[in-house]
Amino acid sequence: MAFAAVFSIVVLVHEFGHFIIARKAGVKVYEFSIGFPFSPKVLTLFRNKETEFTLRLLPLGGFVSFSKEEDGGADDLFKASYLNRVLIMSAGPLSNIVFAFLVLVPVFILGRQLLITEAVLASAKTVWLILSGTVVVIFNFFSGNGSWEGLAGPVGIAVVAGQAASKGLWSLIYFTAILSMSLGVMNLVPLPALDGGHIFMLLIEAVRKKPLSLKTYQAVNLIGLSIFLILTVLVTYKDIIKLIA
């Protein structure tokens, strides 16, 4: 239960970042969804202008869709300027990081009895330490110098969320901030299907002064999603073995 609540909040913050900047840039968002993109739509929560807010069958992850078509056809995002597209893509991860900072301030004030100025500084320091630590773990993993021990899948995160919840509200909120920061940094990695991957592809377009085709985007994203599904399965297997060992 704690895992579902924490993960939903973190994903909502991330997708809202994309959503609000897209709206500001005049890019239409046709769906705002909580759940894995390719899982069936089970519920329409409400509608606002052209946006349908939905819940998918697999409630892990989330996305905003800039296309009217289920298969991700041409959308308004491709018509936006390079700058606006970069801002939209980076808004999700940055929202996670800002959210973590804002959440940690009351944790330090109410949970650890610090003064406001002390809490702000402690929050900023914590954000920096977690961000830099996450970057090191990710870099070491992809460079071959790290191990699986630094990674956690849904099962591992659920276990830690449960442990945090058992220690009280402030521990759970602190864990939420850490998860939010980790999600933000992970999404900035320049790999397919991640926000960082989209930004990297935009840089390629800017250098070659020619847009990549929609089919190229779809193929790259499909490959990226497949890779991350495989990684998720492997990490989840590791978490389960660790749990029952």
Question: Each PLM stretch: what is its role?
Answer:
Residues I34, F63, P93-S95, T134, ...:
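Long, contiguous hydrophobic alpha-helical segments, chiefly transmembrane helices and signal peptides
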Residues V10-V13, A22, G26, L60, ...:
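Alpha-helical transmembrane segments of polytopic integral membrane proteins
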Residues M1-G73, V189, L194-R208:
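Small-residue-rich helix-interface/hinge motifs
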Residues A2-A5, V13, K24, G62, ...:
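Internal alpha-helical transmembrane segments
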Residues D75-S90, V105-L183, L203-I223, L234, ...:
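Functional transmembrane alpha-helices
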Residues G146-L151, L188-L194:
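Short helix-coil transition sites and intra-membrane helix breaks within transmembrane domains
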